[in-house]
Amino acid sequence: MMEKINKQVAFLFSSSILFIAVSLLFVSCGQAGKAHTDTPTSGVTTIGSDDSYTPTVNAEIQVFQALYKAAAIHVKYEPEDSLFKGLMKDSLQVIVAGRKLTTQEETYFKDKQLFPEQVKIATDAIAILVNNDNPDTMLTMDKIKAIFNGDSTWDSPGKGKITVVFDHENSGNSRYIRENLMKGSKFPTYCFALNSNPQVIDYVSKNKGALGIIGVNWVSNDYDSATVGFLNKAKVVYVSLTNGGQHFQPYQYYIKTGDYPLCRDVYMIKTEPYMGLGSGFLSFVTSDKGQRIIFHEGILPATVPTHIISF
């Protein structure tokens, strides 16, 4: 009887070894030509980010690389549309964007047996800028919606026509406006795109009738000399959710309370199928240290307290 049991155990053991060996063979075949030399804290990788989050992403990378000397993270700052295309083409495996994957995109990855990790890292806001000489610094949501649906005149007498400028035609900023204020319709002819958030700030500073749309991260850290320079070039508009209601600027605190109406969540999305440098960087950004960097940058971190920064 014992001999029979021993033979059964031996058979099960040898079968398990065979199964593991075959599984490893399939994995190695699937990874053929994809030898990975990076680890969560070393090596070289390239991630993608919407230009709206450049200050925060740069700050995160600077601290991460200071902690892990063997790590080098490069960034492609691209329009949101290009980031998701890169993710689907596998030219990018980690991105920072103002939206999650769509159902169609999730299905695409599922069909490829990939299950992306989508992690909320922060909440930021759309900031509206006007020229320093423009007295119209308080707008209602009704007025903002009207501007993007054909009303091209400033309320103040003598201010003339409005010109609206974005960072990029396919950026997260322009998508947010289309989806939330325009019901997906096309931009009016007096709206046009530049190539970056700093270009928007510069344009507004030189054109009295301009209204600029940027990610608030570019003007949210008043400890940063570049931010102070931007804030000297243009004014950040106060926005009221209702007519006759209180107006708020996109301070970190008012993003948290929801009093400032033009807010959105920020996500890191990872398709990296192994524990590489992209995975390590995502873990860092979501850690206490990484979240405190976001806090310091003036947008709302997912997990730590907030304060008011005066523009």
Predicted segments — roles?
Residues 29-69, 73-76, 80-81, 85-88, ...:
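Exported/periplasmic ABC-transporter solute-binding proteins
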Residues 1-46, 311:
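Bacterial Sec-dependent N-terminal signal peptides
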Residues 113-117:
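Periplasmic N-terminal soluble interaction domains immediately after the signal peptide in Gram-negative
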